[in-house]
C-alpha cells in the first residue's frame, strides 16, 4: 500500500504487497478497470474449483446473491463471470432451481499415479494460483491430483486423510488446518510416516511433526513491513491478525519484535484478532466498526492478508477515509 506520510509505493516480492490501488504506471485505476479485475478473479476462482473437482459435477453452484455477499462484488461483475462459465459449459442454469456444475472431472486423471492435495481453504485470490502451479508441475511429471478442501476444520482433515490413505496415493501435499493449535490427527500422520508416503506441507506446518514444508518467512516478512512503516514516521501502528493459523501468529511475532527493536510503543487496544470460525462476524460491517473504534487513532495498520485488507479498505472508503491519504495499510499475499 502507498504510505500515507511519504506517498511512496514499495512492493516486496515473496507475496507481500504494499499497495495503493495503483495501475502499472502508478496511476489510480478507473472503476471499470477494477471491475474487470474483480470479474477475472471471480472467474478464475470458480473455474479452478470446478475443474479441480472441489465442486463436483451436478453439485449446486453458489447463487448470484451469495457470490455478491461473499466477495462484495456488484451484480454485473458476478453475472459477467457466470456468463463466461456458462458459455464454456462449466455451469448450467435451471429455471426455478438454480445453477449447477456441468463438468465431470472424474475421468481427467485416468490411470496416472495420484498425489493428494489437501488445502485448508479456497479464497478468490490465492487458491487458483496455488492449485494451477501444483497441477502444472505434477502433470508435467505424469501425476494426477486428488484435491480436497478442509475449510480449516480438523474433523474434515481427518476424513480426507483417511480417504486419501485408502486410495493409496503416491504422495501428499498438505496445507495444515488450524495450524496454530495442537493437531488431534496424530494417528493419521504417524500412519503416513509409517507407510513412507512422501509428504510436503505448504504455507505452514504442525509442531513436532517430522515433515518438510515450503513456507514464506512470515515473521521476517512482518518485521520488514513494520520497519518500513516505522522508518516513514509511523509510531501509532495497529494490526488485524488471525490467531488459529500459524501464519497469523508468526506475522504477529515479527510485528511486535520490530516495534520492540525500534522502541515503538505497543498498545494492546490497537491489536484485533479473528479466527476462521468468527471471520464472517468480525469482518462484517458491524465487526469492522468495532475494530475501527479501537484502532482509529492509528496512522498505519498491518492486516493479515489482502482478503481482509479489501474488506477493511472498503469499510474505510464508506466512512470517507482513504488509503494512503488518511491511513497506511500493509498486508500479505495477493
Language-model-detected regions and their locations in the chain:
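Short, flexible, glycine-rich and Lys/Arg-enriched loop motifs at helix boundaries
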Residues: 105-112, 175-188, 277-280
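Short histidine/acidic/glycine/proline-rich micro-motifs that form metal-
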Residues: 121-124, 151, 177-181, 242-246, ...
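Bacterial carbohydrate/catabolite-sensing allosteric modules
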Residues: 1-7, 13, 17-28, 41, ...
Amino acid at each position: 500500500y502507498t504510505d500515507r506520510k511519504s506517498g511512496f509505493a514499495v512492493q516486496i516480492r515473496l507475496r507481500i504487497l504494499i499497495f495503493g490501488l495503483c495501475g502499472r504506471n502508478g496511476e489510480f485505476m478507473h472503476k471499470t478497470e477494477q471491475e474487470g479485475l474483480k470479474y477475472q478473479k471471480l472467474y478464475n476462482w470458480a473455474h479452478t474449483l470446478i475443474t479441480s473437482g472441489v465442486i463436483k459435477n451436478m453439485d449446486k453452484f453458489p447463487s448470484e446473491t451469495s457470490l455478491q455477499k461473499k466477495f462484495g462484488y456488484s451484480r454485473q461483475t458476478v453475472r459477467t463471470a457466470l456468463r463466461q462459465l456458462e458459455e464454456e459449459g462449466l455451469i448450467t442454469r435451471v429455471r426455478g432451481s438454480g445453477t449447477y456444475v456441468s463438468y465431470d472431472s472424474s475421468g481427467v486423471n485416468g490411470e496416472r499415479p495420484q498425489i493428494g492435495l489437501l488445502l485448508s481453504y479456497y479464497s478468490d485470490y490465492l487458491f487458483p494460483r496455488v492449485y494451477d502451479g501444483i497441477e502444472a508441475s505434477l502433470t508435467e511429471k505424469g501425476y494426477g491430483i486428488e484435491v480436497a478442501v478442509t475449510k480449516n476444520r480438523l474433523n474434515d482433515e481427518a476424513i480426507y486423510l483417511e480417504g486419501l490413505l485408502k486410495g493409496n496415493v503416491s504422495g501428499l501435499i498438505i496445507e495444515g488446518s488450524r495450524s496454530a493449535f495442537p493437531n488431534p490427527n496424530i494417528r493419521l500422520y504417524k500412519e503416513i510416516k509409517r507407510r513412507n508416503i512422501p509428504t510436503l506441507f505448504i504455507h505452514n506446518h504442525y509442531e513436532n511433526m517430522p515433515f518438510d514444508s515450503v513456507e514464506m518467512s512470515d515473521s521476517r516478512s512482518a518485521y520488514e513491513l513494520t520497519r518500513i512503516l516505522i522508518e516513514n514516521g509511523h509510531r501509532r501502528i495497529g494490526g488485524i491478525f488471525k490467531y488459529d493459523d500459524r501464519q497469523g501468529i508468526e506475522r504477529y511475532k515479527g510485528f511486535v519484535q520490530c516495534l520492540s527493536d525500534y522502541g515503538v510503543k505497543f498498545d494492546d487496544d490497537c491489536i484485533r484478532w479473528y479466527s476462521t470460525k468468527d471471520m464472517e462476524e468480525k469482518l462484517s460491517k458491524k465487526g469492522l466498526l468495532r475494530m475501527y473504534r479501537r484502532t482509529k487513532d492509528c496512522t498505519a495498520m498491518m492486516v493479515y492478508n489482502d482478503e481482509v485488507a479489501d474488506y477493511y479498505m472498503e469499510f474505510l472508503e464508506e466512512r470517507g477515509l482513504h488509503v494512503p491519504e488518511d491511513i497506511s495499510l500493509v498486508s500479505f499475499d495477493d
